[in-house]
């Protein structure tokens, strides 16, 4: 089995962002996705257009007992960082009513670009792959 520095469980939006970020930092990275392809749920976001961020991200946009939980996250990686990352990947925005979409207005283009970036960075993409267990070992974790 190949030694991997980072294993990301799930090849959705968050998983792909995590994998790209880890690989850009030099980590040998693998994504394990149970669906037959990465980014499948991304295809339905924004009515198939992939609304990837919003101009307004105040606390009123979040529900739950503690909407302030998002503040430390946005301090580290906010809306401007998201737009910059997408532009670095070649995904330029089309803004409608404060919602950011790829200029193509096609969610599939976002999935394809993240797939190409993963390939470029050498990220192992395992699809149609069920996860049975994660065991802590003395040197890390064993995933089966």
Where are the regions that the model predicts?
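Residue-level preference for short coil/turn positions at secondary-structure junctions
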Residues: 2-4, 25, 139
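Beta1/beta-strand and adjacent pyrophosphate-binding region of the FAD-binding site
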Residues: 1-14, 30
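Fold-independent oxyanion-binding glycine-rich loops
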Residues: 11-12, 33-35, 46-47, 54-55, ...
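Glycine-rich active-site loop/strand segments that organize a redox cofactor
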Residues: 47-97
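Short glycine-/acidic-enriched loop or helix-start segments at secondary-structure transitions
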Residues: 18-19, 41, 136
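Glycine-rich FAD pyrophosphate-binding loop
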Residues: 7, 23-47
């Amino acid at each position: 089995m190949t030694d991997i520095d980072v294993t990301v469980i799930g090849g959705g939006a968050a998983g792909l962002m995590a994998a790209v970020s880890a690989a850009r930092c030099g980590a040998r990275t693998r994504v394990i996705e149970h669906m037959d392809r990465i980014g499948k749920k991304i295809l339905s976001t924004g009515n198939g257009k992939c609304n990837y961020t919003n101009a307004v991200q105040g606390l009123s946009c979040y529900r739950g007992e503690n909407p302030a939980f998002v503040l430390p996250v946005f301090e580290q990686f906010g809306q401007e960082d998201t737009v910059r990352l997408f532009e670095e990947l070649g995904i330029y925005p089309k803004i409608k009513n404060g919602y950011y979409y790829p200029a193509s207005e096609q969610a599939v283009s976002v999935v394809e670009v993240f797939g190409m970036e993963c390939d470029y960075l050498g990220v192992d993409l395992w699809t149609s792959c069920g996860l049975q267990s994660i065991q802590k070992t003395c040197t890390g974790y064993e995933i089966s």
